């Protein structure tokens, strides 16, 4: 099992809050939930940060009471946001874990 040269393999994990957010957003019928899977695939594939920044407005969040250092924000379209982070895998030294933390609108996540 090898990732791109010099890259660690990645896996995805979901917080309990993210799972609830996902169900709520999917049930509303107003958001393209396939975009969540698409971005997850890009993150696992080590897509260059420049590509994510250009297409999805990927950027770091400022650490505060709500968000931790290392948390990032991707704009999936309009007012549809994904908060995630990438950490070393807790059990496998040669892997990273992409953690989907929250999903929602600006009002849901920052208001």
Task: Label each region the model flagged.
Residues 1-78, 87-97, 101-111:
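Basic, Lys/Arg-enriched alpha-helical interface segments
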Residues 84:
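Acidic, metal-associated active-site segment
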């Amino acid at each position: 099992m090898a990732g791109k040269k010099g890259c660690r393999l990645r896996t995805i994990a979901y917080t309990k809050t993210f799972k609830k957010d996902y169900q709520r957003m999917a049930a509303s019928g107003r958001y393209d939930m396939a975009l969540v899977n698409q971005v997850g695939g890009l993150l696992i594939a080590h897509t260059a940060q420049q590509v994510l920044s250009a297409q999805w407005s990927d950027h770091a969040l400022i650490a505060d009471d709500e968000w931790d250092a290392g948390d990032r924000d991707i704009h999936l379209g309009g007012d549809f946001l994904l908060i995630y982070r990438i950490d070393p895998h807790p059990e496998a030294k040669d892997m990273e874990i992409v953690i989907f933390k929250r999903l929602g609108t600006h009002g849901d996540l920052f208001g």
